Structures are given as structure tokens and as C-alpha cells.
Amino acid sequence: LAENVRLTDLVGELEVANARRQATKDTLEHNAELLLIQIQGGSPLTPARYDYARRVARATELRDKIASAKWVDPQLLDEYTSLYLAELGIASSREYFFARIPVKDQLDQTYYKWAECLMNGNWSVYFRTIDGEIVGSYENVAGSGPPNYEFRQDVNDKLREDIVAALTSARPEDYREKVAILQEKAKIYDPKSDLQKNY
């Protein structure tokens, strides 16, 4: 009889342990899914070290790894924690970088220009073309639902001044050298340049 009671207690303990294991796994799986959604909802225009596609792929891989795991081990929990903390760092980052972005001319034709950019966390990017002609922001214009990021050039004068001031204060010391290199690269794509006329 004592053996029967002992075995019954063990079965009960195993059921409780299994329920706890499943609840922990479900919670981590849910959190990994939320993290993936947060990354997908962030700005795709980022400096190379915060590559959007690589971050989405890493979060997707982690979510799938958690889903296929039988239990949550410390290594899996550490992997989630490091990814979560990295995304928190990106969300508060203001980083200066250069990018070749689509802009529109007076005839509403789209073409690409090099621009200096300032990342405002993972929700927007300020930009100014290196020739200084176009100033604007890249942000989510969707009121609700899936994110829809667009380049906005039609900013008012006050916002334009604020964007230029933010970009100017974020410039690194070697800013002028990088701009000179990008201006040379821009000549390759300029249809009015001698290089394009020759070819």
C-alpha cells in the first residue's frame, strides 16, 4: 500500500512538472513571436550593423528553434535574452549613417540619391541628400495594421530645420571625407555627368 501511494505521488509530481515545462515553453514561444513582430514593425532603413533582414531572420530562427524544442534550457533562454536586449538597444539608438535612398523630383519621378541619415531608434530615420536639396523623414505612415514605411519629403520648415540640426549635431569627424567619396559615386549615376554622356 505504501508503494502504491509513493508511485501515485510521483505521477502527480511528474504531471505538475510537465505542466510547468509546457507553460514555460509556451510563454517563451509567445515572447519570441512578439519580439519578431516588433522587429518586423520597425524601420527597414538602418545602418549595416543593424541590418533589418538579418535581424528578422535571426528572430524567426529563434522562434522556430523554441517551437521545436522539448523544453526551455538555459542556452535557449540566454539566446532569447540577448536578442531581446539587442533590440532594446536598437530601439533607443540614434546612429548616423549614409544610404542611397529613393527621392522624387518636381515631376514626381523617382530616382536615387545618396543621403546622410540619422536613425531614431527603430521607428524613423531623418535624411538629407548630400547635395542638401532634399530633407525629410522615413517613417511608418500606416495608422493601424501592418507597417507602411515611406520617405516623406514634404516636411514643413520647422521640421526641416529640426532635421538638419539633428543631422548636423550627429555628424562624425570624418564626415567631409565620406561625403566627398559619395559625391564621386553619385556622378556615376548622374545622367548629366561627363561619365554618363561618354557612355
Name each model-derived stretch.
Residues R6, R20-R21, R49, R54-R58, ...:
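Arginine residue identity/basic-tract feature
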Residues L1-L88:
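Charged heptad-repeat coiled-coil "stalk" segments of single-pass membrane proteins
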Residues F98-R100, K104-Y199:
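Long mid-to-C-terminal scaffolding/interaction modules that assemble large complexes
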